[in-house]
Amino acid sequence: SGFATAVSGHSNRKVREALLKQAEKLTHAPDSPTLPRALLAKKLAEIMPRGLKRSVFGLNGGDAIEIALKLARSYTKKSEIIAFQGGFHGRATYGCMSVTSVNFSKKGCFPQVPGMHHVPYAYCYRCAFGKEYPECNLWCTDYIVNMLEGGMTGLAEPAALIVEPLLG
């Protein structure tokens, strides 16, 4: 499915063997309680910082985004979310579409979820501001700091920052 090749190791031998071993036991369990899920939740509870003992599992990246948005807003009691321009977080749900800045996934689906703010990704190779490092003095980070500290941006205390690690 989708980008499953990236998460399954691009045909790495050890990953293939682990997948085959697991396929002999259980191949699919949508939201069903299973022993592997319980063991993973237990392990996560053991290694998480004090006070963070609960786990929420989703079936895909869209679930991960929706769960993250819900938890961030619920925990912080704040509604604003920052995402980066060029990020793609899915198009199946309104939360995913709203933090995605790619236009083709939003076409005809307005209004979006309120409180989403897109800022330029700090990427020196293709600077959104047309500047060059190091002469720019990391102007892109100053821009984001101004978004957070500036009195006129409406973004003083965001609930979360959503980052796509493979932005491209």
Describe every region a protein language model picked out:
Residues V7, A29, E132-C136:
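Pocket-edge positions in alpha/beta enzyme catalytic cores
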Residues H28-L35, G51-S55:
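Short, flexible active-site-proximal loops enriched in glycine and acidic residues
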Residues F3-L20, P30-K43:
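A structural motif shared across PLP-dependent enzymes of the aminotransferase-like
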